[in-house]
């Protein structure tokens, strides 16, 4: 307990009608060079609206580049060469970027064919990002 409240690490807000909205987790927040907060979960939710994206992880290794690793849906690979897959996923990210404020836009896109490891509640385990090596993934842009 902290100040009489349970500290879960969740970040959110109450709207005018006192509805609670969870926007992210405190430990995942990216603070860019301009001091603006970027919530990876918000960007991931935008990407999930595409039927091309099975899963994604958004992060920053240097607080100026917003990076995404995308696991495309299997249909994206069907009867396509890798260059076509890369273009399809990159175009999907460009569409997502149009919906985001400029400081939240993704500027590096990687593709993986592997499933992300998940918790028992089906959230992606982000601990692998500490050892992120771009050579382990397919660059899409």
Show where each model-derived region lies.
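Conserved C-terminal "lid"/linker of ANL adenylate-forming enzymes
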Residues: 30, 94-141
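AMP-binding/adenylate-forming catalytic core of the ANL superfamily
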Residues: 11-102
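Alpha-helix boundary recognition
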Residues: 1-2, 48, 130
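Flexible, active-site-adjacent loop/turn segments at secondary-structure boundaries
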Residues: 3-4, 28, 36, 114
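Adenylate-forming AMP-binding core of the ANL superfamily, especially NRPS adenylation
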Residues: 1-3, 16-17
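Active-site metal-binding loops of divalent metal-dependent hydrolases
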Residues: 4, 10-11
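A structural signal for the hydrophobic beta-strands that form the central parallel beta-sheet
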Residues: 7-8, 22, 111
């Amino acid at each position: 307990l902290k100040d009489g409240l349970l500290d879960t690490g969740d970040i959110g807000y109450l709207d005018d009608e006192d509805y609670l909205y969870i926007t992210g987790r405190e430990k995942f927040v990216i603070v860019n060079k301009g001091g603006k907060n970027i919530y990876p979960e918000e960007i991931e939710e935008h990407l999930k609206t595409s039927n091309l994206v099975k899963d994604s992880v958004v992060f920053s290794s240097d607080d100026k580049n917003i990076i995404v690793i995308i696991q495309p849906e299997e249909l994206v690979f069907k009867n396509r060469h890798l260059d076509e897959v890369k273009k399809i996923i990159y175009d999907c990210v460009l569409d997502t970027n149009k919906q985001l404020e400029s400081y939240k836009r993704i500027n590096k896109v990687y593709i993986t064919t592997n499933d992300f490891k998940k918790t028992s509640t089906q959230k992606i385990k982000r601990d692998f990002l500490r050892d992120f090596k771009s050579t382990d993934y397919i660059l899409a842009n």
